Amino acid sequence: MDKFVKLTGVAAPLPVVNIDTDMIIPKDYLKTIKRTGLGKGLFAEARYNEDGSENPDFVLNKPAYRDAKILVAGDNFGCGSSREHAPWALLDFGIRCVISTSFADIFYNNCFKNGILPIKVSQENLDKLMDDASRGSNAILTVDLENLEITGPDGGSIKFDLDEFKRHCLLNGLDDIGLTLEKGKAIDEFEKKNAASHPWAA
């Protein structure tokens, strides 16, 4: 998993509340267990017309936001079913940070397992960031995970809170497998001691 230390990029505004995982990645795209290629299905029902052509009114289809790395979204983002394809689709599109006032718990935790930083802010700060994100190609935000700070295009900054363990994992690019490997030496030492003291179990 790639480390997340500092991210600077275009932020796309999506001022819609209760965006569920079916909206993030419709069920038609859930037939694969591969993490790649799902970006094309991200927000598919909103991004594409019935004939498969792009909907020019959807934010991620607008030229300024096609390469967005940050998503500023309405309250209760990621609600609904627990499909892990939702963060996979965001990541495959290129989005590594989602900012909202709240997230569904399962989606929130799945983000950290896949190298995405979900940030919770107050409604007041979300309104400001949504305004910043509405500047098109000038909607550049910098998310500094080391200092827990978001800097806007005008230089103003917003602090955010994050569980220290989750912060550690993102800063070091550790998913569940990475965490286990990080403890590899301690696991080996335990196995040796356990085998010596309980030879019948070896």
Swiss-Prot record:
EC number: 4.2.1.33
Catalyzed reactions: (2R,3S)-3-isopropylmalate = (2S)-2-isopropylmalate
Pfam families tied to this protein: Aconitase_C
Example GO biological process: L-leucine biosynthetic process
Alphabetized SUPFAM superfamilies for the sequence: LeuD/IlvD-like
Disulfide linkage: none
Gene3D superfamilies listed in its UniProt record: Aconitase, domain 4
Entry GO MF terms: 3-isopropylmalate dehydratase activity
Top-level taxon of the source organism: Bacteria
Keywords: Amino-acid biosynthesis, Branched-chain amino acid biosynthesis, Leucine biosynthesis, Lyase
Quaternary data: Heterodimer of LeuC and LeuD.
Family: Belongs to the LeuD family. LeuD type 1 subfamily.
Name listed for the protein in its UniProt record: 3-isopropylmalate dehydratase small subunit
